[in-house]
């Protein structure tokens, strides 16, 4: 089906609501948009609908994760990851959050491992994995990035990223005071 997308060149500030058919088609095929701008406008409209209680957060989450598979603009990736995090923590029903967080972190881990080496997107995805890791596989990957036993080609694990990885491990219950003290002694900044 076709997607009727108003303000597709983003020439004005407007809150755009899509018709039901355009919304359904756009969300289902968001990763088929050839350009970042129309995809971003569609997702911004969907996000407004989530915030207004007109679209289930789960539908936005699925579309945002699909868009992250194809998005190449760093600023758009950053915004999508922020909305994904907010969606998981504030807009999904409490009963769905645990499962959704684990599934989202799995997707983010896959994307981080496949991201272009050394790019902003790779770094943003690695940070997002650390922030959402909850399963054994996810926390094992974060711990391996931190200790260097697994590397993502091109990812520089500097002191700032080390802290983000460790914070994620602490939040997931995989690290604690001992690891924090060790990192403090390692941090010469």
Predicted features by range, described:
Residues 1-189:
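Non-catalytic accessory/interaction domains
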């Amino acid at each position: 089906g076709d997607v009727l997308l108003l303000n597709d060149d983003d020439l004005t500030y407007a809150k755009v609501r899509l018709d039901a058919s355009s919304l359904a088609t756009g969300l289902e095929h968001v990763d088929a948009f050839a350009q970042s701008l129309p995809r971003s406008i569609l997702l911004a409209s969907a996000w407004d609908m989530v915030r207004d209680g007109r679209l289930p957060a789960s539908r936005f989450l699925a579309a945002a994760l699909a868009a992250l598979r194809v998005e190449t603009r760093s600023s758009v990736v950053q915004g999508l990851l922020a909305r994904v995090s907010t969606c998981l923590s504030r807009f999904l029903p409490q009963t769905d959050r645990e499962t959704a967080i684990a599934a989202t972190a799995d997707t983010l881990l896959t994307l981080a491992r496949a991201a272009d080496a050394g790019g902003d997107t790779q770094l943003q995805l690695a940070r997002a994995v650390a922030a959402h890791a909850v399963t054994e596989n996810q926390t094992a990957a974060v711990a391996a990035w931190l200790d260097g036993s697994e590397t993502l080609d091109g990812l520089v694990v500097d002191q700032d990223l080390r802290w983000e990885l460790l914070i994620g491990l602490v939040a997931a219950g995989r690290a604690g005071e001992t690891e924090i003290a060790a990192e403090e002694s390692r941090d010469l900044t």
